[in-house]
């Protein structure tokens, strides 16, 4: 999924607080021409729509700086939220064109109902729900699906068990635990009943 965002260069000497009062959110684009950065402004309404569809370090964005002029692919690297108002405060983008593989965070989606949960009353324990991977910008997956249907109580899946799309490489240790099925949880009342029965 690629999303197009229109932006403008930030006027020199402009104050971030004044920009926000006028309905503009300050932003920066890094990685443009190597280490050069560009100060930007984006309309608050555009940012609001963007954040409904984009995750930090995940979604490829077509960023258009109308008065630069510059247009290219970028990732939203950082999002600052106002501590009191809970509204977007500042955005940082990273230009990915010409940088080869990039590092992104990808959500994990667990599909199916584990046998150990459905038939044996076990509990599905998801240890991680996001994973850092390396891939080319055009290969960034929106989500990585993991089928847990065949997991029984005591079974687990590690990163090495995940079928990654071609060109996507996990950056965490392959032995790292992702999901497992735990035995049914016994309540205090049930435990007391079992103790009385045993005695």
From Swiss-Prot:
Domain of life according to the entry: Bacteria
Give the family this protein belongs to, as stated in its UniProt record.
Belongs to the bacterial ribosomal protein bL25 family. CTC subfamily.
Assembly with partners or alone: Part of the 50S ribosomal subunit; part of the 5S rRNA/L5/L18/L25 subcomplex. Contacts the 5S rRNA. Binds to the 5S rRNA independently of L5 and L18.
Extract the GO molecular function terms from the UniProt entry.
5S rRNA binding; structural constituent of ribosome
Q: Which CDD domains match?
A: Ribosomal_L25_TL5_CTC
- Under which name does UniProt file this protein? Large ribosomal subunit protein bL25
Q: Which Pfam families match?
A: Ribosomal_L25p, Ribosomal_TL5_C
UniProt key word Ribosomal protein = yes
Per UniProt, the keywords (alphabetical) are: Ribonucleoprotein, Ribosomal protein, RNA-binding, rRNA-binding
- GO annotation, cellular component aspect: cytosolic large ribosomal subunit
Write out the function statement from the record: This is one of the proteins that binds to the 5S RNA in the ribosome where it forms part of the central protuberance.
Gene3D superfamilies (UniProt xref): Ribosomal protein L25, beta domain, Ribosomal Protein L25, Chain P
Q: Which InterPro entries match?
A: Rbsml_bL25/Gln-tRNA_synth_N, Ribosomal_bL25/Gln-tRNA_synth, Ribosomal_bL25_b-dom, Ribosomal_bL25_C, Ribosomal_bL25_long, Ribosomal_L25_dom, Ribosomal_uL5_bac-type
A Gene Ontology biological process noted in the UniProt record is: translation
């Amino acid at each position: 999924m690629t999303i197009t965002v229109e932006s403008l260069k930030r006027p020199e000497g402009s104050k971030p607080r004044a920009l926000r009062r006028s309905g503009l959110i300050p932003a920066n684009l890094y990685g443009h021409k190597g280490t050069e950065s560009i100060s930007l402004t984006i309309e608050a309404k555009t940012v609001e729509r963007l954040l409904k569809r984009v995750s930090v370090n995940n979604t490829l964005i077509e960023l258009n700086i109308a008065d630069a002029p510059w247009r290219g692919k970028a990732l939203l690297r950082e999002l600052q939220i106002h501590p009191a108002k809970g509204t977007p405060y500042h955005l940082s983008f990273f230009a990915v064109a010409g940088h080869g593989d990039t590092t992104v965070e990808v959500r994990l989606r667990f599909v199916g109902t584990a046998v150990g949960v459905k038939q044996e009353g076990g509990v599905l324990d998801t240890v991680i729900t996001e994973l850092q991977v390396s891939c080319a910008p055009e290969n960034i997956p929106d989500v990585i699906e993991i089928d847990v249907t065949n997991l029984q109580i005591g079974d687990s899946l590690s990163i090495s068990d995940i079928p990654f799309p071609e060109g996507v490489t996990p950056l965490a240790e392959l032995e790292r635990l992702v999901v497992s099925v735990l035995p049914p949880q016994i309540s205090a009342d049930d435990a007391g009943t079992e103790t009385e029965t045993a005695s």
